[in-house]
């Protein structure tokens, strides 16, 4: 399937909804869907395909990235406008984010969709759900806010925001139930990533990498504020590592939308990393890799799916870090470690995110088979916990959405 129907599209992704007619033509039931970052775009694309398989007459509108647009979605505005991380980093973007929120609300009011799906990005999506609370439109939030990790008091704001909450992690429904909210586990989308289909030899041949050269994956993040903080540290780390590993080959998989930014940031590196934007090439890179260094988040599960030994690192604005440490309630930031209940992969955060410490950790991953094997054994246990009861995660999420969509409006329950 190359394309899906899109409601009332005129091919203009950034038009002002307030300047259009007061209604748009409808060709079937409309689902308005919003993703705010690269991982949400992947989830959204798979969800669109699964929904279309269950009801081919569905049409889609909203905001998404390249993968959702490849299925026919004409994004209301660039998804990259919403991708921002950090309590301090968001401040310069507040005016733009407020404008995008207004545009999204106006578009929903104009289209009057049968259902709205918001994916992750709670800083933006939960405000959007609140703005349309009185519209009578059914609402689904996909990827439960991680309030179990930090700022638990936010849970008091959730009643009434959605009709259905779809959870990726198996412990989340119980956590929300204890606080009077219903969540439904649909499995983790990483299980559908296709990582295990990668081919190591194909990657080395395509990029002219010698068979003996160690391949190290570097994942600095998909948000504008992440890479500029991590990449300078990665560069200095590589300067240290190339003394011991002169043929080390760094690979940076990134979403196409931020590839130009990454290329600009690394243009003067003495060791030029391979920039990978194609999803299949990324999977081949994982297959070829000896280890990885990644920011925290879903990427840790993706690497675990690829059986790639890793360390997790992160660096944010010092003020953001100070505030976050007071609010975070969990012992680990890496999803692999959280699900394992122990530190499976090293976490080198903030002041521990230094070139020397990163180089020492990567060197261990390249030279210590026991460390590698312990990680890989833990990966298998963690991934077993992420499967939905039946089918794929996208199918399970689509089934929940279709169930709500088919309910009479009067029966839709507000959590």
Swiss-Prot record:
Keyword list, A-Z: Glycosyltransferase, Lipid A biosynthesis, Lipid biosynthesis, Lipid metabolism, Transferase
Top-rank EC class of the record's enzyme: transferase
Statement: the UniProt record of this protein carries the keyword Transport: no
MF (Gene Ontology): lipid-A-disaccharide synthase activity; phospholipid binding
GO biological process: lipid A biosynthetic process
Pathway per the UniProt entry: Bacterial outer membrane biogenesis; LPS lipid A biosynthesis
EC number per UniProt: 2.4.1.182
Pfam families, sorted: LpxB (PF02684)
GO CC, one annotated term: membrane
Region of interest called Disordered, as start-end residue ranges on this chain: 1-21
Reaction(s) the record says it catalyses: a lipid X + a UDP-2-N,3-O-bis[(3R)-3-hydroxyacyl]-alpha-D-glucosamine = a lipid A disaccharide + UDP + H(+)
Stored Gene3D superfamilies: Glycogen Phosphorylase B (3.40.50.2000)
NCBIfam families registered for this protein in UniProt: lpxB (TIGR00215)
Family the UniProt entry places it in: Belongs to the LpxB family.
HAMAP family: LpxB
Function text: Condensation of UDP-2,3-diacylglucosamine and 2,3-diacylglucosamine-1-phosphate to form lipid A disaccharide, a precursor of lipid A, a phosphorylated glycolipid that anchors the lipopolysaccharide to the outer membrane of the cell.
Protein name: Lipid-A-disaccharide synthase
């Amino acid at each position: 399937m190359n394309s899906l129907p899109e409601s009332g599209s005129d091919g203009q992704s950034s038009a002002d909804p307030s300047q259009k007619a007061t209604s748009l033509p409808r060709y079937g039931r409309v689902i308005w869907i919003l993703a705010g970052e690269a991982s949400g775009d992947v989830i959204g694309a798979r969800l669109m395909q699964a929904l279309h398989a269950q009801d081919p007459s569905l049409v889609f509108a909203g905001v998404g990235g390249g993968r959702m647009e490849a299925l026919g979605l004409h994004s209301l505005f660039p998804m990259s406008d919403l991708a921002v991380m950090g309590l301090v980093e968001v401040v310069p973007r507040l005016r733009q984010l407020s404008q995008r929120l207004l545009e999204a609300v106006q578009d929903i009011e104009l289209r009057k969709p049968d259902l709205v799906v918001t994916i992750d990005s709670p800083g933006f999506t939960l405000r959007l759900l609140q703005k349309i609370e009185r519209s009578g439109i059914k609402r689904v939030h996909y990827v439960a806010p991680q309030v179990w990790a930090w700022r638990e008091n936010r849970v008091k704001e959730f009643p009434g925001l959605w009709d259905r909450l779809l959870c990726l992690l198996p412990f989340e429904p119980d956590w929300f139930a204890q606080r009077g909210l219903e969540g439904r586990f649909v499995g983790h989308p990483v299980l559908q990533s296709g990582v295990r289909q990668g081919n190591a030899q194909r990657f080395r041949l395509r990029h002219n990498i010698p068979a003996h050269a160690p391949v190290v994956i570097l994942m600095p993040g998909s948000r504008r504020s992440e890479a500029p903080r991590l990449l300078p540290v990665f560069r200095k780390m590589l300067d240290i590592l190339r003394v011991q590993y002169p043929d080390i080959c760094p690979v940076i998989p990134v979403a196409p939308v931020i590839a130009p930014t990454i290329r600009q940031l690394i243009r003067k590196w003495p060791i030029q990393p391979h920039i990978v934007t194609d999803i299949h090439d990324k999977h081949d890179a994982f297959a070829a890799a000896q280890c990885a260094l990644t920011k925290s988040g879903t990427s840790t599960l993706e690497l675990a799916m690829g059986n790639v030994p890793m360390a997790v690192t992160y660096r944010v604005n010092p003020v953001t870090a100070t505030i976050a440490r007071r609010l975070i309630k969990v012992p680990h930031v890496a999803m692999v470690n959280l699900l394992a209940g122990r530190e499976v992969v090293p976490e080198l955060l903030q002041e521990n995110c230094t070139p020397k410490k990163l180089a020492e950790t990567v060197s261990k991953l390249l030279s210590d088979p026991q460390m590698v094997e312990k990680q890989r054994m833990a990966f298998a246990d963690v991934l077993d916990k992420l499967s939905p009861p039946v089918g794929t995660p996208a199918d399970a999420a689509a089934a929940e959405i279709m169930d709500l969509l088919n309910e009479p409006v009067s029966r839709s329950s507000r959590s």
